[in-house]
Amino acid sequence: KDNAGKKGKGGTRYQNSQFYFRNGFCWTDVNTTYIKSRLKENGVYDVLSMSLFSLSHKIPDWYIVCLLNSKYISEYIDNFINSTQHFQINDAIVPIKIPTEKELKEFNEIFSRATELKKQEFKNEKNKGEIYEELDKLQDKLDSKVYSLYEITK
């Protein structure tokens, strides 16, 4: 770490290497009010696509992706944590509610279907209009599940 802070001097230094090549989830730094998160395969990460990693095997990364992709969590972050268009690592103080096994299964079904639809979109296997229509319905279902999970009435 002799080169830390010395611009133009020394070699490259590695940061947070304990997180290299781990699966996690990420989002783009600049967002609208509604955050869109996704799973991230093994790799090395940078600030353009912020990444987090679950510390508990009881809470799968895809579940946190579901929560972050919900309107409730986006609005919670916008109203109580950070009202800018940047959702950053330090903003990750979102209350994560532990789901029951039944709830976890329901979230997994939504996540799996949305993932399959996005794969079909990228492979041009299905009409994009049909895909977006089904994704909109899944978003509504996800939002309803998250509101119910947090015991919020609209």
Model-predicted segments: where are they?
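Polybasic, glycine- and aromatic-enriched phosphate-binding surface used to engage nucleic acids
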Residues: 1-105
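Non-catalytic DNA-recognition/assembly elements of restriction-modification systems
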Residues: 97-154
